[in-house]
Amino acid sequence: MSLLLFHLNASRTMNMEFFHRTLFVYDQQIIYKHRNLFRKFETTIPYTHVSKFFLTEGIIFSDVEIVAPGLKESIKLRYVTKRGARIAKFLIDEKTKAFGGKASAEDLENIDKIEKYIGRLYELKKNRKISQEELFIRREIFLKKIEKNNRLG
């Protein structure tokens, strides 16, 4: 089972859609889900296939675009939170470096620490030591520490 590191939702109201577009960042792959009134779309991208990740920041919202060579068109999420977009970019950049073999020892240690901590939180939730709300709170606190340490903000 893959470990969910982060998920990013696009704004439904700003995009004028019934359902929001979602990007799930797992430890092995990225999953993009989009739904229309009658159809559901889901795309799975391994980190080895991610060629570019574009982050465009506005005053309030950000736009995220992922380009992979095997896709018909690039994945675009418009009107996402700036903080969430920065964290997703950091995680995806670290994972693509790790899977591409271009990562330094410090980068690999950093991504291992993230995966171990979040994996431990999910394990505690599974054993009913912490609740779902506490899991989200602890994960957000940990991601804020990462954001502060890597100067993503």
Which residues are covered by each model-predicted region?
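Short, compositionally biased strand/turn segments
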Residues: M16-F38
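Short, charged, amphipathic alpha-helical segments
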Residues: Q132-E140
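Short Cys/His-rich micro-motifs in 6-15 aa windows
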Residues: L143
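Acidic, Ser/Thr- and proline-rich intrinsically disordered linker/docking segments
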Residues: M1-F18, K40-K126, E147, R151-L152
